[in-house]
């Protein structure tokens, strides 16, 4: 990949980083609204690709994107999926050992994480 994520179009990111050939219905409109207005409301059923609304923009932004999720199992699944796509992500929740938390803190300070999932 010659261009970094900040220089790629959303369609290129979708293909090259997420492995999809096209957006699902409604995704393009929500991403456009986020880009133009900084906020959007999208109501979609389970499995409709809502995670893309914060995962794709996270690749364009400097720093880390914080994702609050009450479901640890869902966080684990999403992080595993991101890792398969070579996207740096981690989670903070009460199940982690102190050494794991310290490692995540080091990665945050180093600026290597793009997404950090936290449980309330």
Segments the model singles out, each with a brief description of its role:
Residues 22-120:
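Conserved P-loop/Walker A NTP-binding site and adjacent catalytic elements of P-loop NTPases
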Residues 6-10, 100:
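Alpha-helical structural motif
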Residues 9-25:
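Dynamic helix-loop-helix/coil hinge segments at AAA+ ATPase domain boundaries and subdomain interfaces
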């Amino acid at each position: 990949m010659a261009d970094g994520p900040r220089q790629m179009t959303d369609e290129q990111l979708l293909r090259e980083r997420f492995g999809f050939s096209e957006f699902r219905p409604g995704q393009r409109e929500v991403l456009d609204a986020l880009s133009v207005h900084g906020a959007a409301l999208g109501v979609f059923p389970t499995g409709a690709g809502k995670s893309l609304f914060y995962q794709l923009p996270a690749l364009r932004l400097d720093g880390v994107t914080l994702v609050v999720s009450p479901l640890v199992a869902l966080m684990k699944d999403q992080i595993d999926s991101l890792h398969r796509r070579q996207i740096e992500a981690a989670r903070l929740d009460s199940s982690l050992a102190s050494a794991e938390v310290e490692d995540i803190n080091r990665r945050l300070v180093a600026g290597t994480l793009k997404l950090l999932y936290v449980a309330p």
